[in-house]
């Protein structure tokens, strides 16, 4: 189930935030069949065609969620688990490595204010995508780098952005990007205490070992 009291992490200044009246309604149509399950989507009502979902795995989801919710144009964020075999896994089960899930941030964004490529640019530079199944001292398949796309358009943009970032990483002596780019499976909300963890604990753990290499500005012109 969605975390209790789930609210927009970064509501836009003019509209777009979830209203209390709409909370709890079940969505009849979602952006793509590959989006989160309708049960979970009941708490993330898509209020216009300009709102979309994106899913990213960058290691520990605490710090990643904070980076995304601070971006102007994101209207909701939540953390959870994707890409595993067990239904509705617990944090302990995911951390055991036995379920195959990755820690993931779900980002709802207003495409009239921020693009999917903007989110990808933040994704690539907030972690080290060349380290397989680890970020800094966090080691395990749950910390793998991953993009779960919700449409063919997202898939194409993600693949092109990977190529663009790989080119600049290679020039700077880094190895091959290990990020998996896959269709979005079901998203399982993480436990309540994980949601916006660093808002509740500003000095909490935020382990992201970045490459320090900026995403190439010219890549936006090509994609």
Predicted regions and their residues:
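N-terminal, intrinsically disordered charge-dense segments
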Residues: 5, 26-42
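Short glycine-rich, low-complexity segments
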Residues: 5-7, 18
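Compositionally biased amphipathic helical and low-complexity segments enriched in hydrophobic
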Residues: 19, 23-27, 45, 52
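Flexible coil/turn and secondary-structure edge motifs
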Residues: 42-223
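Intrinsically disordered, low-complexity segments enriched in serine/threonine/proline/glycine
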Residues: 10, 20-21, 29, 40
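Secretory pathway export signals and precursors
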Residues: 11-12, 31, 56, 203
